[in-house]
Amino acid sequence: GVASVAIHKCSQNSEAFEEICIASRTKSKCDALKEKLEGTTKTKIQTAQVDANNVDELIALIEKFNPDVVLNLALPYQDLTIMDACLATKTHYIDTANYEPEDTAKFEYKWQWAYREKFKEAGITALLGSGFDPGVTGVFSAYALKHEFDEINYIDILDCNGGDHGYPFATNFNPEINIREVSANGSYWEDGHWVETKPMEIKREYDFDGVGMKDMYLLHHEEIESLALNMPGIKRIRFFMTFGQSYLTHLKCLENVGMTSIEPIMYEGKEIVPLQFLKAVLPDPASLGPRTVGKTNIGCI
């Protein structure tokens, strides 16, 4: 998954990342990644077990390892506990996705932005949304405004996955987060306010360089929120992502039978969340790399 990709990239830049501690609820996964990387990098790698929902455990781990920065690649539900631990230890913080309550399929920056003054007073930095989208797409937009244009009024962010993993249905990142995102209402920013749409209501076609013509659908995405706040003169920001017909057909069937629900149900005397159960039976995104062929194309217009 994304954590493995990030750790590989850090290890390729050992002059900057001299030492890394990989921590997860399942330490064996960290150990396997360490073993895979040993002999390929000068970066010293340690591993640890931690529950990212437990602030005290996080504080203890940070104090033991004493890192310069915590790179949060856990679930979005865990952003705030990790930020609390960074505040308590005065450690810089980076993440790739904004906070989302586990029991509500709604993500926005307000919870994390509320930490701004606390981090400022502690003398530490929190860098939010540092993936590709959000992340690089924000850099593209800010660079264009600073160096290429006097004013930018409209931004469309397009995310095209032109790869094929050979499965009838699988997600390229955490299935639980992916399905919550694409099955939620869409929204875009226009003339100073949010416009909400039904899931997959707005569809467009676009000819992506190196990929070809693809169907894309308007989604809510967190960088719309940050760009609307930080791009003076902006009138409209939208986010589109491509999906193949097989993906959409499977998703609709799963929705129809209740498998995308986040409401707990009782099954054989145990409480389960249908979407979390679905995640357990779908292919692990970390396993898709070797069998995926094709290109991706992400950018701003």
Model-based region annotation:
Residues 97-124:
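Rossmann-fold NAD(P)-binding glycine/threonine-rich loop
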Residues 19-21:
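Short beta-strand element of Class I
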